[in-house]
Regions:
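Active-site helix-to-loop segments that bind/position phosphate- or nucleotide-bearing substrates
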Residues: 2-24, 33, 39, 90-339
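N-terminal ordered "arm"
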Residues: 22-54
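A surface-exposed, charged beta-strand/loop segment in the N-terminal or early-internal portion
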Residues: 44-47, 52-125
Length: 339
């Protein structure tokens, strides 16, 4: 399956097993096992996501890297396997400031607080929106708890205490997330490794795709994705990407999942269990990718710049704002908080 917009540069999702992707002139040529072929103009591709047994030829990979296009590799079931990235951007001075702030605990704490505040505010907004029609007292109580957690963010004196606040706020949110779900699917709690029900399976896949979007934006701006402020560096862990991703989790990934479930776009029959782990079936993954891409292209009124732009563009704007704060061009890093 290929998903891409006819006009905008978007993510190219390669999901058809045993496909081969070649490069010819200004196109990627996707050859399917049944001999069908599809031509994709390279000028319309900003990123590539490969799921499972899909082969990209060396010329295709060289062309993508030469154009600065990242390739993300997932397993057939959507687990992250790795990323092929172009050379790091040449702005060494920006990364030097990133490393300096990372080493300064108080400066790093300011960024970490902004990331947590943005996440909790957007989680709370999701609950407030849903409860306009639900009128559920438990959801209302959760919004009060989360407002209390948001107020505590600025009082946190260490990243450790901040993570505790984030954990309490997330627990309140996911404690009532199941009440936002309509229909026969059930959500009781967040289960990451492994996902054992359809909603957790979709949340995990959504977060994986979101992490790739954020990592690609960080690559474009020229920051180091492995040096963060909230998430501490660990071997192979894209800490900065996880930091920036926090404020987008509820308004992109969670929103996609609720849309799919509540409009019965996917049902329990679109999932399969293997060794206690629940996965989306191949056709269901195609649908999920399409809905995720739709959300990235959806526009909103940007709260700081006062113009309409897409969620995909908002991700890059947030990374650029972080870069400007690191270099002292703006006084604060403000997370993207929606209303």
């Amino acid at each position: 399956m290929i998903l891409q917009d006819e006009v905008l540069m978007t993510t190219l999702y390669l999901n058809e097993q045993q496909s081969i992707v070649k490069k010819r002139d200004g196109y990627l040529i996707v050859q399917y096992p049944d001999k069908r072929t599809v031509e994709v103009p390279l000028v319309k591709v900003s990123q590539v996501v490969v799921s499972g047994d899909v082969t990209l030829t060396t010329p295709a990979l060289h062309t993508l890297l030469g154009m600065g296009i990242e390739v993300c590799f997932l397993s057939m079931y959507g687990q992250f396997r790795g990323r092929l990235s172009p050379p790091v951007a040449k702005n060494v001075f920006l990364r030097r400031e990133q490393y300096r702030v990372h080493a300064d605990q108080q400066c790093a704490l300011k960024v970490a607080q902004a990331c947590v505040r943005g996440k909790l505010e957007n989680m709370r907004t999701m609950l407030l929106r849903a409860n306009r029609s639900l009128q559920d007292p438990e959801v209302a109580d959760a919004t009060v708890t989360m407002q209390h957690m948001i107020r505590q963010v600025s009082c946190a004196s260490t990243v450790g205490s901040l993570l505790g606040i984030e954990g309490n706020g997330s627990a309140a949110y996911f404690g009532v997330f199941g009440k936002l779900v309509r229909g026969s699917m059930v959500f009781t709690h967040r289960r990451r490794r492994p996902p054992t029900d359809p909603i957790n399976a979709m949340l995990s896949l959504g977060y994986t795709l979101l992490l790739h979007q954020v990592s690609a934006a960080i690559q474009v701006v020229g920051l180091d994705p492995y040096v963060g402020f909230l998430h501490q560096p660990r071997y192979g862990r894209p800490a900065l990407a996880l930091d920036v991703m926090e404020e987008f989790r509820p308004i992109i990934a969670d929103s996609v999942v609720l849309n799919i479930v509540n409009h019965r776009i996917l049902t329990e029959q679109d999932f399969q269990e293997e060794l206690g782990v629940v996965h989306l079936k191949p056709e269901a993954r195609k649908t999920f990718y399409a809905k995720f891409e739709e959300r990235l292209q959806e526009e909103l009124q940007h709260p700081y710049f006062d113009y309409r732009t897409s969620y995909r563009r908002c991700i890059e704007l947030q990374v650029r704002l972080l870069g400007k704060w690191l270099t002292g061009e703006i006084p604060h890093y403000l997370p993207l908080s929606v209303r």
